[in-house]
Amino acid sequence: MILANVFCLFFFLDETLRSLASPSSLQGPELHGWRPPVDCVRANELCAAESNCSSRYRTLRQCLAGRDRNTMLANKECQAALEVLQESPLYDCRCKRGMKKELQCLQIYWSIHLGLTEGEEFYEASPYEPVTSRLSDIFRLASIFSGTGADPVVSAKSNHCLDAAKACNLNDNCKKLRSSYISICNREISPTERCNRRKCHKALRQFFDRVPSEYTYRMLFCSCQDQACAERRRQTILPSCSYEDKEKPNCLDLRGVCRTDHLCRSRLADFHANCRASYQTVTSCPADNYQACLGSYAGMIGFDMTPNYVDSSPTGIVVSPWCSCRGSGNMEEECEKFLRDFTENPCLRNAIQAFGNGTDVNVSPKGPSFQATQAPRVEKTPSLPDDLSDSTSLGTSVITTCTSVQEQGLKANNSKELSMCFTELTTNIIPGSNKVIKPNSGPSRARPSAALTVLSVLMLKLAL
């Protein structure tokens, strides 16, 4: 009887392992056909080397170049070209912010993706690679300037924005590029033209793209206890030249102007992708990544959609592009929605406060704590344990799971209840989604191991 039970257990174990290791369990519908993104410049080179891809790419560009794009895309030849390109590396290609050939990369990206949508979309997918770094990484790099070992009373009274400017002056690259944009943005052209905004924007883009975040973030997102500090923070980008104008344009008109430029369009799409309020995360940010949101916000500075603090309030953080919703007509609701993504964005507000306080998701605050502004939730996601840092939440961590023979509902021998503990390796999370995969793109191996452990102990007990 015992041998029969052992044989049955062996058979059950074999079938369990086969089912867990089968291809159907490895590839769910959400991962089927997924390809890692390729640099669009490189993807274009690969397409050019293949005759079918290159000819179809030329055809699609001709289809999109016409005045009536929708009519052209209805053409069978255009549709065939698009279908071929969707199977090429060009379809999944992405770009890196500040890369050497960024504009060329973005032009290639939009030459494909502008043909995939009908009409104007409110939110567009970001052409940039997902951000994997966290705020805690920035804190570690900036720790030599953070004054974490200083007296809390002295630290609370200090002007953090002034300290950030001093820290920038200690770095040659930061000092050079900051002095450059200050000089250009303060240079008056004529009594009627206070500066050359185009050159000012270019100098600002160079500063935020070329200076490490541990310097730029401290100047842009420094925490303030008084109005003088908050005004210095507001003046960081020289708003009289780079931000303000005689009149505020309509926000939808400003968005339309921005989307005619590949760089501005891409930075705006990236901001929406990384700062759009999420109802399924603890912080209201996509993937609970403050760093991605702050980087996307800084990436818009120096373009038509440049955002800034609206006032010098040290407590209420409100940012906005220089625009309003006056004259929106029947588009007023859409305009207000667009503007609220800046002025009433809980993700962006929490990210700015978190950086100013020196905190990150599930990291103990080094300064005054704040109450995160929560977006209304449809389904609340529980926070991670206090002893689990954000740097490991997207990596590999160890979770110990304990079970027992009786808990499994199985009948054991008359010996004492035997508890079993086994280790599960948590999965990595694909950026921007709740789906999980293993480091080797395989399924979780914890479950077969767990089943093997449980059944082995059962076999041992039955044999005894």
Curated annotation (Swiss-Prot):
Which keywords appear in this protein's UniProt record, sorted alphabetically? Cell membrane, Disulfide bond, Glycoprotein, GPI-anchor, Lipoprotein, Membrane, Receptor, Signal
Region of interest (Disordered), ranges? 363-392
Source superkingdom: Eukaryota
Q: Mind listing the GO biological process terms from this record? A: cell surface receptor protein tyrosine kinase signaling pathway; glial cell-derived neurotrophic factor receptor signaling pathway; nervous system development
The lipid modification GPI-anchor amidated serine is placed on 444
Quaternary assembly: Interacts with NRTN ligand and RET: forms a 2:2:2 ternary complex composed of NRTN ligand, GFRA2 and RET receptor. Also forms a 4:4:4 tetrameric complex composed of 4 copies of NRTN ligand, GFRA2 and RET receptor, which prevents endocytosis of RET. Interacts with SORL1.
What is this protein's record name? GDNF family receptor alpha-2
Which species is listed as the source? Homo sapiens
